[in-house]
Amino acid sequence: MSQTSSESQSLITPTFVFAWLVNFAQFTVFYLLVTIMAMYAIEQFQASDTAGGFASSAFVVGATIARLFSGYIVDAVGRKRTLVVSLIVVTIAMALYFPAQSLPLLFVVRILHGLGYAIASTAVMAVAQSVIPDHRRAEGTGYFALGTTLATAFGPAAGLAIVHNAGYNAVFIVALTLTVVALALGLVVKAPAQEQRSVTFSLGNIVHPAVAPFGVFILFVGVAYTGIITFLNGYSSDVGLEEGASYFFLAYAVVSLFLRFVLGKLQDRRGDNIIIYLS
């Protein structure tokens, strides 16, 4: 087998590793902030529980809006260019947390951060998928998603620990540092050239009856999990179990990490249905 052919069949390549690191940094920042944001709004701006919850979920509002057209942007502009520009937007948004000294400004920053984050995560996923061999697609996607799984353990636990020991500004500094690292990695990652073709945007790009059941299923799962991570910090403080909140995310990540190594190969061999039934 030639060197070129061997490289084309390899799963762990420099492009894949850089994309993995960008994804891990992005999700770590997300979990660092989402876990502490409701309490930050309540303590810093005397927000109600509802407003504090929106301070956390405003990020998701921005991300949801961006998801509607992020795929089109990646196809039209290109994977690498979209990744770099969106990471710049994320870095700017992250820096704006420091001067955002009112609740409305915090909402705006959270929405802007979510917009950039959603486009960046779509672009980095496209970069990773472009170098995963077809016959190892599910396995490679599972390994790539390990970054998200690890972030669910490290991000919330680190966010809670930093807040309790050094305050909210320290969390923002750590998050900004990770964002800058992600931008630096995004600048050096090499994405394969894309085929030049005309791309048009239509309602069919974002709405398709065939995927509606899957979307509703993920919606319910996401709502349940987001509710937990948004208010877990405040709840654990109220009942005197601050350390227990960190263990929750650790247990979640350990189980997810183990399953990632198993389910990707199982999906490649047995198909999608068995994974859905098990989950």
Set out the residue ranges of the language-model regions.
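Short hydrophobic/alpha-helical segments at membrane-entry points of transmembrane helices
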Residues: 19, 104-110, 214
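Residue-level signature of mid-helix packing/kink "hotspots" within the transmembrane helices
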Residues: 60-68, 152-153, 253-261
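Extracytoplasmic gate region of multi-pass secondary transporters
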Residues: 34-35, 213-248
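Conserved MFS/SLC helix-loop-helix module at the cytosolic interface between two early adjacent transmembrane helices
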Residues: 65-98
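Helix-loop boundary and gating motifs at the non-cytosolic
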Residues: 12-45, 52, 225-235
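Cytoplasmic helix-loop-helix junction between adjacent transmembrane helices
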Residues: 109-147
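Helix-breaking motifs and short loop linkers at transmembrane-helix boundaries and internal kinks
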Residues: 46, 78, 99-104, 271
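C-terminal membrane-cytosol helix-exit motif in multi-pass small-molecule transporters
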Residues: 176-195
